[in-house]
Amino acid sequence: EDLKKVEVYISQNENPSLQELNGIIGKIEESNTPITRAAAAYDYSKYLPVSEGQLNSKEKQIFNQNPAAGLIVLAQADYANKSEKGVFGSNSWGTNGDAYRHALWNAMGAKGVGDSYMAAFATAHETGSAGYNPNSIDTQMDLKNNAKGRELLKSMKFPSRPPNGMTIPYIIRNEIAKAVANGKMVRFVSGGKQYSYLMPTNSSSKN
């Protein structure tokens, strides 16, 4: 809904300022309000949040620092969720696909909103989650893959004049997939079995 408002405003106003866009979107309630039924039913181990109602309290704080950037981050989360399913056949936890999803989200998000905001949002996604444990294997995995996605973006080469709007996402997606296949990310599930340590990702394309 907020994204539609922004699209309409941009279509009617040439070069709107960030302040104007943030004014249209507005901030979201940060207090610990009861979790909505939709958010409670959302599987955070297999999907990234794609709407304001699915954010934890720490993510909401980062969102409210720059709501326009926050919407971009949520849109890229949706892109990463769908891309994992398209590439690996499903959305999953602890696998190559999970590593791909987090790294892609961070690379795409950093491309859209800058490294520091994306890093803050992605870290809040982990530290603000229910039952957060900094030493848990899944937290360690996500933080490492988030950082790797942002790091890889810095070495990617993009055309100065992309032929169309899908060129840059295509380049980022391919580079992240290549990095996963080449063992640049980490996971703890292999062949359907869960391990107690992190291991490099590999070229297996099925979750």
Which residues does each predicted region cover?
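Glycine-rich short-loop/terminal segments
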Residues: 1-118, 201-207
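Active-site or metal-binding loop neighborhoods of secreted/extracellular toxin and effector enzymes
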Residues: 143-207
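Interfacial helix-loop-helix junctions of multi-pass membrane proteins
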Residues: 126-143
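Structural recognition of the beta-strand scaffold that forms the well-ordered cores
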Residues: 107, 119-123, 145-147
